Amino acid sequence: MDPILLGKGITDDIAVTLLPKLGNRHGLVAGATGTGKTVTLMTLAEGFSRLGVPVFLADVKGDVSGLAVPGTGAENLLKRAAEIGVADYAPAASPTIFWDLYGKLGHPVRTTVSEMGPTLLARILELNDTQSGVLDIVFKLADDRGLLLLDMDDLRALLGLVAEERKDISTEYGLVSAQSIAAIQRSVLRLAQDGGENFFGEPALELADIMRVNHDGRGMIGILAADQLVLKPKLYSTFLLWLLSELFEQLPEVGDLDKPKLVFIFDEAHLLFDDAPPSLVQRIEQVVRLIRSKGVGVYFCSQFPDDVPGNILGQLGNRVQHALRAFTPRDQKAVKTAAETFVPNPKLDVAKVLSQLGTGEALVSTLQDKGVPMPVQQTMIAPPHCRMGPITDAERAQVRAGSPVGSRYDTAINRESAAELLAQRAQKTVEQAQAPAARSREQDEAQEGGFGQAIKDAIFGTKRRQGMIETMAKQTTRTVGTKLGNQIVRGILGGIFGGKR
């Protein structure tokens, strides 16, 4: 199987390639803003797609969408391709599927609250340890009572139930404070305003739909529209982490293949690790270490190589380092880290060259036969065949119209789950509370004959019309009954739905 051509070595005048059989050994693409990282990602995605490997990546700036349409074939690109040795270079599109958590620029991406789980949901909600513990109790309570947590309404309903039965739940599951519940409810409200209502629900994303191969044998490139999503860093990074965890948990062990089953590109990777607790970082490290045996290659993209923790950085065998500008002590440290992580090349002063690289140039080291990293090469990156810029709305609509997943995800499904079941139980409670009062009124009316009727006739007269005194008496009775009924409804439904009317 032909390797993926990344570019041409300037240092040793050789073709710099990535071996497909080692594509699952993960990778890193790093460099300052404007140095060509996005073009490198597009070249990687195209290369894997041509080999029949599906790719999933986020489009943070909008220009990755250009993968879906052919390039312009500009003279400078043709010249660069000839210099690098790209055979038969011609503009070409890649098979793509657009996804969007908000459902505007692609197929909606959804998962259920249960599938996300309390740990990752707590990260999205930015809860502290105490509040995270209460969220664990909410999930445990849902399991014990057979209540499905599918969407935000279900989560709000369970939080209301916990608030209503707080004392009993605290005795059985552990202390639950009203303050913690209120804090979680406020966080849920913020998440809903940030688009959580669209993300949580059904139909949930099926992994098979991001691992498709088209009829020509090319891997489909799944592009997640993230230009708005990245403005919510916790939601963006946690969604990608959830997706990576789902791949790890659901895919079977396959060992080393001749090419990966999927390549997962994580742009703006620093967002994944910012403020992440040690336990979560340890989990990510475990997933990255083990997921390669399931045929998945993970490629992180960020400005600085040390944005990725050292234990994870050490597992990234294929590296492309674009220019770093050493203006600050932070930048100087990053340059030193980058230089130390490459296999030395006696012809190259890595620390010096890093700050002198031009746009479209990079220091590259990939794994060769037997998994041995090649000495670092200053490399001229090969141009992609697609458009190096965003597509138009009309072009996007055309791609979506031909999507192989059709309209499967375009319409949300709201099946019976926790919110509906708790509402039904609340309604039954209200009906049971009102039933005795109704029976009492029937008995009173039955007793209006005989002695009771004689008394009534003596006081109010025999005509079947309400006098002022009777009218006032009945209005008073109805008012008291209505207020009591409303209080019961508010007490039950208000607790379940967090005060929502």
Regions found by a protein language model. Give the residues of each.
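N-terminal pre-Walker A segment at the start of P-loop NTPase domains
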Residues: M1-A15
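Pre-Walker A (Motif I) flank of P-loop NTPase domains
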Residues: I14, L22-G27, V53, R218-G222
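Conserved ATP-driven motor cores of ASCE-family P-loop NTPases powering translocation/secretion/packaging/pilus
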Residues: T43-A45, A68-D88, Q286-V372
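The conserved Walker
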Residues: V29, T33, A276, P305
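P-loop NTPase motor domains
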Residues: A45-V55, G62-Q286, I312, Q356-L357, ...
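Membrane-active amphipathic alpha-helices enriched in small hydrophobic residues
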Residues: E448-I459, M468-I496
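Conserved lysine of the Walker
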Residues: K37
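Conserved P-loop NTPase motor module
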Residues: L5, P108-S114, L125, V320, ...
